[in-house]
């Protein structure tokens, strides 16, 4: 009796194992970067495609396993051979029909996912290992440049123009849309249409060098009015220092050469190699998602950049006196 109970338990466990593994796999898909919690029109279509294809795969798997078990129990003979052939051809026809239907369904979705946007255009350049973001004007205006964060208005189809000046990167924001490669010398496009507000995490999904794993970005979806207010603020020049510490930090920022690589609009800093820092204090992270944007993190980043993000182009400034680093950090904290 005990042996029989153990056998039954083992059989139940073996049958339940795939379901348990499936549930654990889905549990790992939660969070800011989940494709199964869509917050955009394109992501919702992709999630529907995933679930429908998963259901089709389960149906085919059950049919094939069931047919194999049934065929293995047939007794040899003319009758068994006829049934075996029927099972073989029936299973093949059913699987082909289901797979063809899934293919057609996927192809029908593609034109809508790639349709052009009808409003705002944003140019995003993936660079080792950060993101240059430029909001393109509708007329002859000047692009508004930012870095490592993309802000979108709720409910609008926004077209992203994606490229890279160095190696292949891949722009991937699972809650809002699919993955699109960024190829040097080419411009690829991705259209996003957010359906709810919030902050969502994205990442480079193509290995691009030493600090590939430290190349994240955020997409912040705002109500339309809030987005327009933010865009107007982002277009403005930097805020003048309002304390002696910040004024000293601005002086040192220019003196030690930070302005050769970074732009701070409204000052003599006009470098284009690194991120635009005009409103760096309004961003949530430093170093493309590597550190939170706090006072201590700013000091660490300035003093020992290369240890935090290997092979990054920005040199470490640890040789500067501690008070100088603190002053530069205070200045950057004021650039909201």
Question: For each of these PLM feature ranges, what is it?
Answer:
Residues 30-49, 73-272, 287-310, 316-330:
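Non-transmembrane, membrane-proximal soluble domains of secreted or membrane proteins
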Residues 42-62:
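Membrane-entry segments of alpha-helical transmembrane domains in multi-pass membrane proteins
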Residues 20, 24, 58, 62, ...:
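Alpha-helical transmembrane spans of integral membrane proteins, capturing the lipid-embedded, hydrophobic core
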Residues 335-336:
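Short, solvent-exposed mixed-charge patches
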Residues 1-31:
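N-terminal secretory/membrane targeting signals
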Residues 61-75:
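Alpha-helical transmembrane segments
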């Amino acid at each position: 009796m005990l042996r029989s109970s153990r056998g039954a338990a083992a059989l139940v466990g073996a049958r339940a194992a795939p379901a348990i593994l499936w549930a654990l796999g889905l549990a790992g898909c939660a969070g800011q970067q989940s494709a199964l919690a869509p917050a955009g029109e394109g992501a919702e279509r992709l999630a529907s495609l995933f679930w429908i294809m998963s259901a089709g795969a389960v149906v085919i798997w059950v049919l094939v396993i069931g047919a194999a078990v049934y065929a293995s129990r047939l007794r040899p003979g003319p009758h068994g051979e006829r049934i075996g052939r029927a099972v073989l051809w029936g299973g093949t026809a059913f699987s082909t029909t289901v797979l063809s239907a899934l293919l057609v369904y996927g192809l029908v979705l593609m034109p809508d996912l790639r349709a052009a946007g009808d409003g705002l255009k944003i140019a995003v350049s993936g660079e080792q290992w950060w993101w240059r973001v430029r909001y393109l004007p509708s007329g002859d205006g000047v692009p508004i440049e930012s870095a490592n964060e993309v802000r979108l208005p709720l409910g609008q189809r926004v077209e992203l123009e994606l490229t890279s000046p160095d190696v292949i990167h891949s722009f991937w924001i699972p809650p809002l849309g699919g993955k699109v490669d960024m190829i040097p010398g080419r411009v690829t496009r991705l259209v996003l249409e957010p359906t709810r507000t919030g902050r969502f995490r994205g990442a480079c999904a193509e290995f691009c060098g030493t600090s590939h794993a430290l190349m994240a970005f955020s997409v912040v979806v705002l109500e339309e009015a809030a987005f327009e207010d933010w865009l107007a603020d982002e277009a403005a020049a930097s805020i003048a220092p309002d304390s002696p510490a910040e004024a000293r930090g601005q002086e040192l920022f220019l003196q030690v050469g930070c302005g050769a690589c970074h732009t701070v609009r409204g000052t003599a800093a006009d470098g284009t190699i690194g991120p635009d820092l005009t409103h760096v204090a309004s961003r949530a992270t430093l170093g493309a998602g590597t550190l939170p944007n706090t006072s201590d993190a700013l000091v660490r980043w300035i003093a020992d950049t290369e240890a935090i993000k290997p092979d990054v182009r920005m040199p470490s400034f640890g040789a500067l006196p501690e008070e100088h680093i603190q002053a530069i950090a205070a200045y950057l904290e004021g650039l909201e």
